[in-house]
């Protein structure tokens, strides 16, 4: 029986979304702009990386052709390989959003057909009645922030006041999200998670997709830094996903990284926690060794988005891509006959774009494994085709939204 390994390179978009203008993202292209900056020397950083973007393994899996089909151009400064291995294409998101749950749920065969709730960008972000209920039910004297903000910026700006007053820092972004930053020692991690659970219950009526706990440590604005104890409190997907269907048919779903949180821990057999792309790859490789016939290993590589995309760090994003590319050889060595690897993304987060938010883009679709014939699958109409292809590979019935490319 077959196994499947689904890797989401969080935010690794390839541009070209036909509805990007509706999201203020016309022209956004995460891969294309990173390559362009690197080719021009703007992706160099002493001691980290220099020169054109170099992704030889991903290129041999069709990344150059994917970029051209999605955005109409090859990435600058990157050689085109003589031969491509495996299946390659791009996918267009049909969900109404450019957020993490929408992208992942659609990848798993369940597009989001409803509109998320969002908070206003002008004035106070949160309704007064929400803040009053949250402070009352969670037992705090008030909150700080109450605005749209970058997570690292608001910690630097309000972290010392948070320590002094004991008030959690609450903020949002262009996503359907309520984020809470608090000091792990002065406020306490358990207290932060309990606060977020209260917020999750109150925010359902506002149709907010996620509450995110953002713990940090440090003593002053110059030393504050986030820890690896982030946790997402998501609403449930609107209908059964690929993960639920696999469980229903007696298979195992191994969720590596934040996958469990994204799916509200539904359709998960086993959670494997790890922080940072390198540790996530280590955990994924170990899980591949342990996976049985019929299993799915599902990993989100979060650093591309959280550490580099939102912070608009081109050299950091480029270096992370190159490090991931180098480790694909370790994945190749572990594959057995019948295995399928799928590489994709959930949205874009162009590090050259204005602001700090996600960008609406198409995503790459790469599928390979022993016996997989190389071919182009063009531009798919929905991310859901990915989930349906995995369903077919693992021998379970098709779902209602996507079409398999296998």
UniProtKB/Swiss-Prot annotation:
The keyword Metal-binding applies. Its EC number is 5.4.2.7. CDD domains: PPM. It is found in: Cytoplasm. It comes from Rhizobium leguminosarum bv. trifolii (strain WSM2304). Pathway: Carbohydrate degradation; 2-deoxy-D-ribose 1-phosphate degradation; D-glyceraldehyde 3-phosphate and acetaldehyde from 2-deoxy-alpha-D-ribose 1-phosphate: step 1/2. One of its GO terms (molecular function) is magnesium ion binding. Binds 2 manganese ions. Isomerase that catalyzes the conversion of deoxy-ribose 1-phosphate (dRib-1-P) and ribose 1-phosphate (Rib-1-P) to deoxy-ribose 5-phosphate (dRib-5-P) and ribose 5-phosphate (Rib-5-P), respectively. This is Phosphopentomutase.
């Amino acid at each position: 029986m077959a196994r499947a390994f689904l890797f989401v390179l969080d935010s690794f978009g390839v541009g070209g979304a036909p509805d990007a203008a509706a999201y203020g993202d016309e022209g956004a292209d995460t891969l294309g702009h990173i390559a362009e900056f690197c080719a021009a020397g703007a992706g160099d950083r002493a001691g980290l990386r220099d020169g054109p973007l170099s992704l030889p393994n991903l290129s041999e899996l069709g990344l150059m052709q994917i970029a051209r089909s999605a955005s109409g151009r090859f990435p600058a400064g990157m050689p085109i390989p003589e031969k491509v291995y495996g299946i390659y294409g791009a996918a267009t998101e049909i969900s109404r959003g450019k957020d993490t749950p929408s992208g992942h749920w659609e990848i798993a065969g369940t597009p989001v057909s409803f509109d998320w709730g969002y908070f206003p960008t002008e004035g106070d972000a949160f309704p007064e009645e929400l803040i009053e209920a949250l402070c009352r039910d969670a037992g705090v004297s008030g909150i700080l922030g109450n605005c749209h903000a970058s997570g690292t910026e608001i910690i630097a700006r309000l972290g010392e006041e948070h320590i002094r007053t004991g008030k959690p820092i609450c903020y949002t972004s262009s996503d359907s999200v309520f984020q809470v930053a608090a000091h792990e020692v002065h406020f306490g991690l358990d207290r932060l998670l309990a606060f977020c659970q209260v917020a999750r219950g109150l925010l359902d009526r506002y149709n907010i997709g996620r509450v995110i706990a953002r713990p940090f440590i440090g003593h002053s604005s110059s030393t504050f830094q986030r820890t690896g104890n982030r946790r997402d409190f998501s609403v449930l997907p609107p209908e059964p996903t690929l993960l639920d269907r696999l469980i229903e048919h007696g298979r195992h779903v191994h969720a590596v990284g934040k996958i469990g949180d994204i799916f509200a821990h539904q359709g998960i057999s086993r959670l494997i926690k790890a922080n940072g792309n390198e540790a996530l790859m280590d955990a994924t490789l170990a899980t591949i060794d342990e996976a049985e016939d019929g299993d799915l290993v599902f990993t989100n590589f979060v650093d591309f988005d959280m550490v580099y995309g939102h912070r608009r760090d081109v050299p950091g994003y480029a270096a992370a891509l190159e490090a991931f590319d180098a480790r694909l050889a370790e994945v190749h060595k572990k594959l057995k006959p019948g295995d399928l690897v799928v590489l994709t993304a959930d949205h874009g987060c162009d590090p050259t774009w204005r602001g700090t938010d996600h960008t609406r883009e198409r995503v790459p679709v790469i599928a390979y494994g022993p016996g997989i014939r190389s071919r182009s699958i063009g531009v798919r109409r929905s991310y859901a085709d990915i989930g349906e292809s995995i369903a077919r590979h693992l021998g379970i019935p098709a779902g209602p939204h996507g079409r398999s490319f296998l």
